[in-house]
Amino acid sequence: MLHRNGSFIFATCVVLTGVIRHASMSTAVAEDVNPNYASFAKAVLDGRNVRLTLDLARCTAHGGEARGPQVRGSIRFDAYMIQGDQTIAFATTHFTVRTDNTAVDEFLSFRVHPNGKVDVRTAFLSPITFSVTQESEFDCDIGQGATFHW
């Protein structure tokens, strides 16, 4: 379910910007840029310290042609999982307060496919019931909105 409400997109951008800024301020610049799925998968299996730089304006809203919001930054993840279909999945979550002063848990998940497609999903969850209250999805490509560094 993709909400196209302007205030939701703004709130998503604010929260993503906070996560991305926090992650990027706590790390040094990585040595290598990942040019494709195969080198990313190898880095994951080799236990490399991988960082994702994200530019949602170079991605599209899931299932459509509209560009994503003007949000850029970097994120580190603690764990990666290569699934049976070779999709690489990873996620992070954090507690935050939206611009309307509503407390939420935000869940960010990523799936990288062998063809280089990257699915980005953000979901706001109620901290009381853990039910999803809002979510958005974006379609990116390795090197086009989503770049991996190690």
Predicted regions and their residues:
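Bacterial N-terminal signal peptides that target proteins for export
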Residues: 1-12
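General secretory precursor processing signal
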Residues: 16, 62, 143-144
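Secreted/processed peptides and extracellular or luminal domains of membrane proteins
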Residues: 19, 65-68, 146
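N-terminal secretory signal peptides
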Residues: 28-98, 130
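Acidic, glycine-rich flexible loop segments
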Residues: 91-150
